[in-house]
Amino acid sequence: MTKHASLAPLLESFFLQRLMQQRQASPHTISSYRDTFRQLLKFAERRLRKPPSRLNFEEIDAPLIVAFLDDLENRQGISVRSRNLRLTAIHSFFRYAAFEIPEHSAQIQRVLAIPSKRFTRTLVNFLTRPEVDALLAAPDRSTWSGRRDHAFLLVAVQTGLRLSEITGLKRDDLFFGTGAHLRVIGKGRKERCTPFAKSTTAVLRNWLKEPQRGDQGILFPSARGERLSVHGVQYMLNKHRQIASAMSPSLEGKRVTVHRLRHTMAMDLLQAGVDRAVIALWLGHESVETTQIYLEATLAMKEAALAKTSPYSGKSSRFRPDDNLLAFLNSL
């Protein structure tokens, strides 16, 4: 008979040993996994009427996890993509458990067999050049926060950094002179360097002359000298989008996020004829195939432009099957 295994020590060792020591996971990954398990434990507490510290491993089984994921999507309204990210964190923990408590392999395999939910992948959303220009002009550069926000937006749209990467930048991560660039630790603890345009270099040089706030050396700190929070960044973007929409009305109905600015940079590179492999390196993608979404967006733009043109006249020579079965297959 399989003995009971307490969940608490196993989950603690997963975070402390597997994620932090062995994998050296980024703070962003750790916080994402932490949030997943906080939500899962609260759900299990309501469902099983037991405090998290008293839960046994075998109680976190496949049916409970599926119910948890369904609850996130249906009751809390998270997207399918977010649901799948939660499942990825749970799968990672159960793969770790497979080595630590192999006697529970049957339960572990059932959890690992829970598939990600399929969803329709939408085309990427990005800003046009007039929209970007209006957004960059929005901050009031007569104030400290306005100068910070202008520099932040310029770096975001010119480098395509992720939210966690740009808020984690330190002043020491900037390198000027010939080949001016910034250094960033991205996904998977991989370091990459991203070059600056001359205009960005000038703005950042001036920004570094500002009195430093806080003692952490953060490049874009909050007013208290701390790292900008996710909500703080989104508040900043919403404020400047609202101001910029007076100059560029098309911004009125758009949601501006750091991720959308990242998409904007990628589209600029692609439309300038930059190879997809270079774009993948620039953005820190593990695979060139990830940049396919930008190519698909470009094709969609071309198709929309084609639809507005006057088509040349000509007779269609498309084959018309006279067989009912072939007609059925062609209709699928």
Swiss-Prot record:
Please name the catalytic residues of this protein.
Answer: R162, K187, H259, R262, H285, Y294 (o-(3'-phospho-dna)-tyrosine intermediate)
GO biological process annotations for this chain's record?
DNA integration; DNA recombination; establishment of integrated proviral latency; symbiont entry into host cell; viral genome integration into host DNA
Domain Core-binding (CB) positions: 5-98
InterPro entries reported in the protein's UniProt record = CB, DNA_brk_join_enz, Integrase-like_cat_sf, Integrase_catalytic, Integrase_recombinase_N, Integrase_SAM-like_N, Tyrosine_recombinase_XerCD
- Protein keywords: DNA integration, DNA recombination, DNA-binding, Plasmid, Transposable element, Viral genome integration, Virus entry into host cell
Superkingdom of origin organism: Bacteria
Q: Which Gene3D superfamilies match?
A: 1.10.150.130, Intergrase catalytic core
Question: Where in this chain does the record put each Tyr recombinase domain?
Answer: 122-307
| Gene Ontology molecular function terms on file | DNA binding
- For the keyword DNA-binding, the answer is yes
What's one Pfam family the UniProt record gives for this protein? Answer: Phage_integrase
User: Into which family does the record put it?
Assistant: Belongs to the 'phage' integrase family.
- Name of the molecule in the record: Putative integrase/recombinase y4rC
Give the organism, scientific name: Sinorhizobium fredii (strain NBRC 101917 / NGR234)
